[in-house]
Amino acid sequence: MKENSEDCPLWINYDGLIILEMFRENSQQATNFLIAIAEPISRPENIHEYQITPYSLFAAASVGLTTDQITNTLQKFSKNIIPRNVKNLISDCTLSYGKLKLVRQSQKFFIEVYNDKIFNFITSDEILKSFIVNSNIDELKIEITNVEKIKKRCIEIDYPLIDEYDYTAYESVNMIKNLHIDLKPSCHIRSYQEISLNKMLGNGRARSGIIVLPCGSGKTLVGITAISTIKKSAIILCTSAVSVEQWKQSILLFTTINPYSVSRFTSDCKEWFENYNVENTSQGGILITTYSMLSFSGKRSYDVQRIINKIFAYNWGIMILDEVHVVPAQMFRKVVSSVLHQCKLGLTATLVREDDKIEDLNFLIGPKLYEANWQDLSDKGHIAKVECSEVWCEMTAEFYREYLIQDTSKKRLLSIMNPVKIQMCEYLIQKHEAQGDKIIVFSDSVFALKEYAIKMKKPFIYGPTSQTERMKILKQFQINSKINTLFLSKVGDTSIDLPEATCLIQISSHFGSRRQEAQRLGRVLRAKKRNNPNFKAYFYSLVSKDTEEMHYSAKRQQFLIDQGYSFKTIIGFNDMYYNETRLYKTKQEQKELLFNLLSKNLSSDETDK
């Protein structure tokens, strides 16, 4: 322990785990530093946990932090002497960074090598050697199709590739089409957005990497600002056609770009900006599309295939990957390596997956450049304060008796269609509609989604809902004072902007998915009313008591708890049964419902494809 240890805010464990005491005077300075060098693990109110990893140190080195700067600053804030193995890890990772650089020349790729010793080391590696086309004194030529594999191998041998794009260089100016775009004078970016962009952009160079911001905190504007700074042709990949529309609206709202320079490529809308710029072929554009449109491997129509060929032949200045956590999926990752681009920016609110592929983003996209603190943004009014509740719904005796003897799929169906859960959902909708709230009800089960919505006479959106109908329903939810509740399947988990929503009710979900829980909470974080005095949004997760739903619910909440949220448990409301017209109130209605459910040949996890 150091002599002044009681004044220092953090403790460094031998395995690189850092415990930060937020009640110390200089804790905020320490927080700002730790964000740059370590991964946030848990950030409740008083005690934060961070983990130093090779990836986090590579990211720190990528923004210019040196070995001495990291160790000296850590020692300044630490109660204890930095363990030797942690010092060695910091030294090894930061000193090896910057020795290899990925260079693009026209449509050719090279690795620039720092010195002869490293050159010999790289060329003697059997895996890397198989990817090298030919070599000169200080550079190695590689094929574009092998870039992903090479990046992965370089990380494994502790020599990560620097992947930067000098967008002011002579070759860039002449080879990549310029984009006439600026932010409008009325558009103001917030301090945390500026900090995140400074991690990516500097001295005329753009670093490929990932920015993590909560839902509703302005990820889209960060991406638009990056495009406006680089001023080169851009391709934006989204998870849905609804998201494509919202990106286009935001680009036209925040920037001075000519609307004809912004194209959409979805199943319903097939545009190519060069068709509208025939008089100025040197002018670039922005294409907004979905991962699925580019990854589809089936037969396409002539017109669609023609645009696809143009997309893959075009030299893009920047690629924006919205909801970047989906990229490690096998069908999507090939899109990243197939589209020719100079730099890429991944955006997400939840850098988590339930498989082990999230770390693949380090070589598919780049290091995490910045991650915001959810509670910080909430305290400053940038996102809404949310009251989170887990609502336990007793199962009726008849339903629970059947639940105990049925197979897994029927168990899920019975727990979702539990009459008490239906009544609780109805009660909460009526309660919050009376308070003037706009409510979203989420269900992964399409069968339950339709049953609940039709019984309660509410609109719903799920997979087969057409794009036109989706936009119409969303618009009515936003502007019509008589449409205050909307039922959504998992198609609404991401990239749907509904700032009018102030209350969320979840009746079924995808097992223990932490990411889905956070994404759904995000639907109410951007509430327009968030800066009103004493305003708070509501998030209810309805679970049938003594079923597997309770186990999965605890797993799902972990990410949000790590972000500083707390869940209170609600067992019931005293006035819930005062309404004589409550759904399934009589024993006879409940028995008929049970009979119908047991006779149906379907599973409750029937979800959108």
UniProtKB/Swiss-Prot annotation:
UniProt-listed Pfam families: ERCC3_RAD25_C, Helicase_C_3, ResIII
Helicase ATP-binding domain mapped to chain residues: 200-369
GO cellular component: nucleotide-excision repair factor 3 complex; transcription factor TFIIH holo complex; transcription preinitiation complex
Molecular function GO labels: 3'-5' DNA helicase activity; ATP binding; ATP hydrolysis activity; DNA binding
SMART domains: DEXDc, HELICc
One GO term (biological process): nucleotide-excision repair
Keyword match Isomerase: yes
Sequence motif DEAH box, location on chain: 322-325
Chain sites annotated for binding ATP: 213-220
Record has Iron as a keyword: no
Subcellular location: Nucleus
Domain of life per record: Eukaryota
EC number per UniProt: 5.6.2.4
Keywords: ATP-binding, DNA damage, DNA repair, DNA-binding, Helicase, Hydrolase, Isomerase, Nucleotide-binding, Nucleus, Transcription, Transcription regulation
Domain Helicase C-terminal residues, every copy: 423-584
Subunit (UniProt): Component of the 7-subunit TFIIH core complex composed of XPB/SSL2, XPD/RAD3, SSL1, TFB1, TFB2, TFB4 and TFB5, which is active in NER. The core complex associates with the 3-subunit CTD-kinase module TFIIK composed of CCL1, KIN28 and TFB3 to form the 10-subunit holoenzyme (holo-TFIIH) active in transcription.
UniProt xrefs under PANTHER family: GENERAL TRANSCRIPTION AND DNA REPAIR FACTOR IIH HELICASE SUBUNIT XPB (PTHR11274:SF0), RAD25/XP-B DNA REPAIR HELICASE (PTHR11274)
NCBIfam families the record matches: rad25
Known role: ATP-dependent 3'-5' DNA helicase/translocase; binds dsDNA rather than ssDNA, unzipping it in a translocase rather than classical helicase activity. Component of the general transcription and DNA repair factor IIH (TFIIH) core complex. When complexed to CDK-activating kinase (CAK), involved in RNA transcription by RNA polymerase II. Also involved in transcription-coupled nucleotide excision repair (NER) of damaged DNA. In NER, TFIIH acts by opening DNA around the lesion to allow the excision of the damaged oligonucleotide and its replacement by a new DNA fragment.
Stated family: Belongs to the helicase family. RAD25/XPB subfamily.
Protein name, entry field: General transcription and DNA repair factor IIH helicase/translocase subunit XPB
Source organism: Enterocytozoon bieneusi (strain H348) (Microsporidian parasite)
Phylogenetic lineage: Eukaryota, Fungi, Fungi incertae sedis, Microsporidia, Enterocytozoonidae
